From Swiss-Prot:
This is 4-aminobutyrate aminotransferase PuuE. Coiled coil: none annotated. GO terms for biological process: gamma-aminobutyric acid catabolic process; putrescine catabolic process. The lineage of its organism: Bacteria, Pseudomonadati, Pseudomonadota, Gammaproteobacteria, Enterobacterales. Optimum pH is 9 for the forward reaction which is the transfer reaction of the amino group from GABA to beta-ketoglutarate, and pH 8 for the reverse reaction. It comes from Escherichia coli (strain K12). Pyridoxal 5'-phosphate binds at G110, A111, D238, E239, V240, Q241, T296. The keyword Translocase does not apply. Pathway: Amine and polyamine degradation; putrescine degradation; succinate semialdehyde from 4-aminobutanoate. Its EC number is 2.6.1.19. Completely inhibited by succinate and low-aeration conditions. InterPro entries: 4NH2But_aminotransferase_bac (IPR004632), Aminotrans_3 (IPR005814), Aminotrans_3_PPA_site (IPR049704), Class-III_PLP-dep_AT (IPR050103), PyrdxlP-dep_Trfase (IPR015424), PyrdxlP-dep_Trfase_major (IPR015421), PyrdxlP-dep_Trfase_small (IPR015422). Belongs to the class-III pyridoxal-phosphate-dependent aminotransferase family. The gene is puuE.
Length: 421
């Protein structure tokens, strides 16, 4: 059956709200290669939206899941616990850059992790308010949509959203927003909208995902830490997209001296299996009463087995170092292209969490059309890319960190051609 035939069936069987970017259907995948039902091959620089830092079907991950399949697939951890969940929590506790002794709870999706981080913060503080940042993305459930600082397509037609959520600008040199602007906005909130003693948490992405890979300045993170300490507010770092070697360190927060109280994780944690988590200061994590946290599939044993494999792969294959090496090669390609492509307004990121932003060279305004044109040129040559950003004018790069050098070089050639056409 052809891609077009599957496409027509999709239109009849599934709602339009589940938007689909590609007009081809996956048949198989290995490492950084995706093959469709017609046999066409693509270099996958989307990785299921940052889920496959260790690549499609890494042999070690497949073996770990297959071994777990032979034992049991589900008990519901809250009913009958299992050792692998506890061991994974111990590993994350030892690795995560959070304040004080750590504890970890596992869930299923990134949005679920963020929801539970807010629950934990509210239980710990007894306060309702949460401050988030414009351009941030935290999920598609109602609380996480409220936290998300981007309207289209996530929020259209779904309001009203949960209250006691406030947004402030995220720093951006390109768009003229300084760290001080962000901090001044928080202080204005304290004066005009909610007193500091009613704020449970400040949540931020150290590198914004959907927002366009904007990197939090170290001065911002330090100032948030000071504000949280001063007012008894829980500091939450959302690492759903940035975690597990993508930025050149295991977590993006490893780039900063200041540590959050809670940290959310998902996506590449389990290499394609549905698993998320919240790790944080043990005293704060213990705030909810027994039964207050959990979920039927939370910490599913197959996904937990995959996560153990992911941590081993990252260590064994030195993927943090690999992320820095590949990211520098990508940055060099984009910076070189900038000399002859006036639409390139900025190249930014950490490690292999790199993005390029496009503006109209005539007006200087953000141009989603240029980003989409380059994305389509690349796709026509077999390179799968994703756009993002508040204006849809950013291309982000989320290749598996396990991609072979020759394939990465081929992708860079396609990218150069797409930028120069």
């Amino acid at each position: 059956m052809s891609n077009n035939e599957f496409h027509q069936r999709r239109l009849s069987a599934t709602p339009r709200g589940v938007g689909v970017m590609c007009n081809f259907f996956a048949q198989s995948a290995e490492n950084a290669t995706l093959k469709d039902v017609e046999g066409n091959e693509y270099i996958d620089f989307a990785a299921g939206i940052a889920v496959l830092n260790t690549g499609h079907r890494h042999p070690d991950l497949v073996a770990a899941v297959e071994q777990q399949l032979q034992q049991f697939t589900h008990t519901a951890y809250q009913i009958v616990p299992y050792e692998s969940y506890v061991t994974l929590a111990e590993k994350i506790n030892a690795l995560a850059p959070v304040s004080g002794q750590a504890k970890t709870a596992f869930f299923t999706t990134g949005a679920e992790a963020v929801e539970n981080a807010v629950k934990i913060a509210r239980a710990h503080t007894g306060r309702p308010g949460v401050i988030a940042f414009s351009g941030g993305f935290h999920g598609r459930t109602y609380m996480t949509m409220a936290l998300t600082g981007k309207v289209a397509p996530y929020k259209i037609g779904f309001g009203p959203f949960p209250g006691s959520v406030y947004h402030v600008p995220y720093p951006s040199d390109l768009h003229g927003i300084s760290t001080q602007d962000s901090l001044d906005a928080i202080e204005r909130l304290f004066k005009s909208d909610i007193e500091a003693k009613q704020v449970a948490a400040i949540i931020f992405e150290p590198v914004q995902g959907e927002g366009g890979f904007n990197v939090a300045p170290k001065e911002l993170v330090a100032a948030i830490r000071r504000l949280c300490d001063e007012h008894g507010i829980v500091m939450i770092a959302d690492e759903v997209q940035s975690g597990f070697a993508r930025t050149g360190k295991l977590f993006a927060m490893d780039h900063y001296a200041d540590k959050p109280d809670l940290m959310t994780m998902a996506k590449s944690l389990a290499g394609g299996m549905p698993l998320s988590g919240v790790v944080g200061n043990a005293n704060i994590m213990d705030a909810p009463a027994p039964g207050g946290l959990g979920g039927t599939y939370a910490g599913n044993p197959l996904a937990v087995a995959a996560a153990h494999a992911v941590l081993n792969i990252i260590d064994k294959e030195s993927l943090c170092e690999r992320a820095n090496q590949l990211g520098q090669r990508l940055k060099n390609t984009l910076i070189d292209a900038k000399e002859s492509v006036p639409a390139i307004a900025a190249v930014r990121g950490l490690g292999s969490m790199i993005a390029v932003e496009f503006n109209d060279p005539q007006t200087g305004e953000p141009s989603a059309a240029i980003a989409q044109k380059i994305q389509q040129r690349a796709l026509a040559q077999g390179l799968l890319l994703l756009t993002c950003g508040a204006y849809g004018n950013v291309i982000r790069f989320l290749y598996p960190l396990t991609i072979p050098d020759a394939q990465f070089d081929a992708a860079m050639k396609i990218l150069q051609d797409a930028l120069s056409d």
